[in-house]
């Protein structure tokens, strides 16, 4: 399929740029890579790609179906349609990303990406295999209503994902006026950090103005060096375990809860919530 071919070429590019980053880090005498962590990251990327290529996901409602049933307009694929759709995808991704951080049951879909205590291009490959159900279809209803063709969405979704790779690096510092427009390495370092001032900030994927609009922006501070990872460290390099460790912990905590109400509530409460 076209997606399989795109993934193959993208992975070649990703690996090449990781080597360049490693060489640059040696020249600059900065410790950027840890071998076991890097192997864990690459393994996560490979398993995620296998899941995608084998189509091991359950799509509750497809964009094709929404387009066929909800489209008010019929528009052809032109350059402005691609731009509009890209902004729509980026807006949807802001909210999927934010909700994955904010709710217990959804955090398991994303924890693997934040589990590394390093921050480098390999870290970008840490993608989940535990998000079996595609639940965020409703965020694409506005695009379907406008009549954005499914072909446009199919082309843009992998491009939007691949465009999030480059800013997972410590080697690029401030990018001047671009800091006000797009997500930069500085913005995303903040997002991956567990320092109190940085937690739950900078959810945007491509355009940083979503964080400005919705009150989740935080600038990287020279006085606050980012500390990476998750608040409850994985303490393992095994990507399969990391993918499901939060889900396992929720099951254990739900069993321990004294009230049936709490056994159910724990899944849908904010990340970190536990019964008193």
For each predicted feature, which ranges?
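Hydrophobic transmembrane alpha-helical segments in integral membrane proteins
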Residues: 1-14
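Central hydrophobic cores of alpha-helical transmembrane segments in multi-pass inner-membrane proteins
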Residues: 13-25, 60, 86-92
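Membrane-interface helix-loop junction between the first two transmembrane segments
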Residues: 19-39
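Membrane-helix interface/capping segments
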Residues: 29, 59-66, 99-106
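Membrane-embedded catalytic scaffold of the fatty acid hydroxylase/desaturase
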Residues: 45-55, 71, 76-228
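Alpha-helical membrane-anchoring segments
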Residues: 51-62, 258-261, 274
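Cytosolic-facing loops and C-terminal tails of multi-pass membrane proteins
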Residues: 224-276
């Amino acid at each position: 399929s076209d997606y399989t071919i795109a993934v193959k070429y993208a992975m070649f590019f990703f690996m090449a740029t990781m080597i360049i980053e490693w060489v640059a880090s040696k020249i600059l005498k900065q410790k950027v890579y840890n071998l076991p962590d890097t192997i864990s990251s690459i393994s996560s990327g490979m398993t995620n790609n296998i899941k995608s290529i084998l189509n091991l996901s359950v799509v509750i409602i497809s964009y094709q179906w929404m387009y066929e049933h909800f489209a008010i307009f019929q528009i052809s694929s032109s350059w402005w349609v691609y731009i509009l759709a890209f902004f729509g995808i980026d807006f949807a991704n802001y909210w999927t990303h934010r909700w994955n951080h904010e709710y217990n049951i959804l955090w398991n879909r994303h924890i693997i990406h934040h589990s590394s205590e390093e921050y480098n291009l390999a870290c970008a490959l840490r993608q989940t295999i535990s998000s079996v159900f595609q639940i965020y279809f409703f965020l694409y209803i506005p695009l379907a209503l406008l009549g954005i063709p499914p072909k446009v969405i199919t082309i843009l979704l992998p491009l939007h994902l691949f465009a999030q790779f480059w800013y997972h690096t410590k080697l690029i510092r401030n990018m001047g006026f671009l800091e006000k427009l797009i997500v930069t390495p500085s913005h995303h370092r903040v997002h991956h950090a567990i320092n109190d001032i940085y937690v739950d900030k900078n959810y945007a994927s491509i355009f940083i103005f979503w964080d400005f609009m919705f009150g989740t922006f935080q600038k990287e501070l020279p006085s606050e060096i980012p500390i990476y990872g998750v608040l409850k460290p994985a303490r393992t390099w095994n990507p399969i375990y990391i993918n499901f460790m939060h889900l396992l912990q929720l099951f254990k905590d739900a069993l321990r809860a004294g009230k049936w109400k709490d056994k159910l509530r724990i899944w849908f409460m904010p990340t970190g919530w536990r019964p008193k």
